[in-house]
Amino acid sequence: MKNRKIRVAITHGDTNGIGYEVILRAFEDPMMLDMCTPIIYGSPKAATFHRKALNIETQFTIIKDAEEARDGRVNLLATFDEEVPIEFGKPTEASDHAAKQAVARAKEDMQKHLYDVLVLGPVVPNPNPNREDKALTIMLSDHVRIGLLTNHLPIKEVAQAISIEKIVEKGKIFFNSLKRDFRINNPRIAVLALNPQLGTEEEQIIAPAIEELEKQNIQAFGPYAAEEFFACNNHEQFDGVLAMYDDQGMLPFNSLAPEFGVKLKAGITAICTTTDHGPSFEIAGQGIADATSLRQAIYTAVDMFRHRKDYDEPLANPLPKLYHEKREDGDKARFAMPRAKDIFK
């Protein structure tokens, strides 16, 4: 099966939202099947209901196991037998449960290596997320990559949630993802300040964390006040930006990427992407949902799979070194951005 296309698992999301619409519309373009082989984790009955109600032409083949997936067609894996009542635009316990069942089955198959990458359909965010999540959420577009140090925290709790250790940990994840997933040889990361005016957290936590990253040969710069940083388009000088909390990263991201965006979970073994929007209940069932973000999430996952393969193969069979590598310091002078140790002098 060396010549088979990349297997892309796609969970159907909340069944009362736009999940099925954007998934099926994404594969109305036959060229998508030239790039990958989709395995939709969901409900054949729910998919059929959405396809007919929204007059979508995409056909799919029902399978019971991921091993049955075939290239050149849209494969729909039945993850549960019970019928799910569809109520467009209304979040219900049944629709949320259906979304969770699809994710649970996809995770099981992930452990069995039955597909290559995972794309999560749009769901309602968990109101009680895992605060100890070691992964890093990265928001991607053609213009910017923004990592979020913390997720779904009230602003008053953010200061207590940040630490030198967490910034170093997430900074390393970001750095490694930029190298392996995006094939950037020596990525530069900007770290944002927590406060509009640099203060205690910046001096005692963020700046020391940046210095520690520098000691580990990671090009980290900052801390930068977020509003001024984006207003001056300083993000264009970096390969990634690490924000301290959701809104600090999401607001400028939405401004810089109004058409579409993709979210990536970095720091986990699997390649996992999702859309930058939720179930969009307000437009569900109207046939006007835009599949661009879902399509871009698939593109990103496929590209990452290829990049990781290209990155990992030489490491598996390395050639003997005939020279001594010297870290390039040119970027420091070329961009003339202040270092953390210089800001608080």
Which functions belong to the PLM regions below?
Residues 1-345:
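Anion-binding alpha/beta catalytic cores of soluble intermediary-metabolism enzymes, centered on
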